[in-house]
Amino acid sequence: GILVEALHRRRERSLPAFTVLSCDNIPDNGHVVKNAVLGMAGKRSAELAGWIEAHVSFPGTMVDRIVPAATDASLAEITQELGVEDPCAISCEPFIQWVVEDNFVAGRPEWEVAGVQMVEDVLPWEQMKLRMLNGSHSFLAYLGYLAGYAHINECMQDDSFREAARRLMLNEQAPTLRITNVDLTAYADSLLDRFANPALQHRTWQIAMDGSQKLPQRMLDGIRMHLERNTAWPLLALGVAGWMRYVSGTDDQGNAIDVRDPLSDKFQAIVATSSDAERVSALLTLKEIFGDDLPQNPVFVEAITGAYQRLVRLGARQAVIETLKI
C-alpha cells in the first residue's frame, strides 16, 4: 500500500518513477513484489497500474548467508561477547553473497565495489542456491534428524552423510541448472565447508520446518527434469523419502518428532490412517506439494517407495550408505 501510494503521488506530480528492490529471502522475489504492487494499483485505477508497469522496475535478488534461529545459548554467548543483553541478536557465518539483477530505472549505487554481484538474470543463481545449498541442507536435515544428528555440522562429521551431500549436489542437482561461468565443483565444496562450521550450531530440526513449502523448489523441480531426461536421481529420492519419514512423526530411535509445518494437521491425519506400506501413496495425495503429475508417474512413485522402504528397513544412516552404492 505504501509503495503504491508513493508511486501514485509521483505520477500525479510528474516526478520520475523509482526502482522497487525486494530484499525478501523468497524465490522470484522481484516478480512477487511486482505482482503485489500491480494488483493493488489496479484496484485504484487501470491508468496507475499501466504507468507503474511502464516506468517502474522490480529487480530480482538472491541473498545467501546461513543464519540459524537464535537460541538461549547463542544469546548468552553474544551477551558475554558484547557485555550487553540484546534479545534481537543473531549469530551467522562469515560468508555473505548478494546477487542483484541490474535493472534500475534511475541509476544505482556502485554496489559491486562492496562485493555485490550485478547480473542480467538472477534466476539461474537462485536455482543454484535452492537446489545445491538448500536442497542438500534439507536432505541433511531430514535424514540427519532421523539418524540422531541434532546439528548440520554433526552430519558433516559423518563421512557417508558428507559424501551423500556432495554427490547430491554435483551428480543430481548441478545437471539440472542452467547457470554458466560458475565452477559448481568448487561451489559444492565450499558449501560442505560452510555446513561443517561448528560455531553455527544449525539445528536439523529448524531446517526441517515447513518442508511442504520447501520441497517443490529444493527437490521436486530437479526430479521432474531427471524424469524428462531419464537420468538417475537416487539421492533425491532418498531426500523425499526422508521428508516422508520425518513428517510421519517418529525418528529412528522411536522418539516423537515435533513436526512444524502448515500442513501438519494433514500429515497427522494421513499417519493415523495409513501403515508404513501405505505411507508413500497416502502422502502423494497432497497435490499442493506433488502436483497432479508426479503421483501419476510410475517411475517417480517406484523410486520414492523404494527409498522409503529402505529407510524403514535400515534406518536413515544405513539407508544413506546403501544409496551411495546405487
Residue ranges of model-derived segments:
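Substrate/ligand-engaging "lid" and interaction regions
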Residues: 1-326
